[in-house]
């Protein structure tokens, strides 16, 4: 038997799928233009049509805090279990925590 591959996007069929109304490759410009400051709380909401700066699927829906900026991307501190993880995420995959509700 051959071992099945476990790539970066395994088991994400329904998680990384857009609804038919949201189809299309271009994220909204307003979502790209948002500037986050250090200390802002954000929700990681992966946009599956944008592959650059995409975090791993385990971070989908997690709330984190902006701790810095690296190029166009942001450094986001996320609690995963009992550990703090720092991930690099582009703004296409972030939503402000206050406006997410």
UniProtKB/Swiss-Prot annotation:
Disulfide bond entries: none
Iron as UniProt keyword: no
Gene Ontology MF, one: structural constituent of ribosome
Entry's Gene Ontology cellular component terms: ribonucleoprotein complex; ribosome
Residue ranges, annotated region (Disordered): 1-23
Residue spans of biased composition, Basic residues class: 1-18
GO-annotated biological processes: translation
InterPro entries associated with the record: Ribosomal_eL21, Ribosomal_eL21_arc, Ribosomal_eL21_CS, Ribosomal_eL21_sf, Translation_prot_SH3-like_sf
Keywords, ordered alphabetically: Ribonucleoprotein, Ribosomal protein
NCBIfam families with a match to the protein in the record: PRK04306.1
Family, similarity comment: Belongs to the eukaryotic ribosomal protein eL21 family.
Protein name, entry field: Large ribosomal subunit protein eL21
Organism: Saccharolobus islandicus (strain Y.G.57.14 / Yellowstone #1)
Gene name, Swiss-Prot/TrEMBL: rpl21e
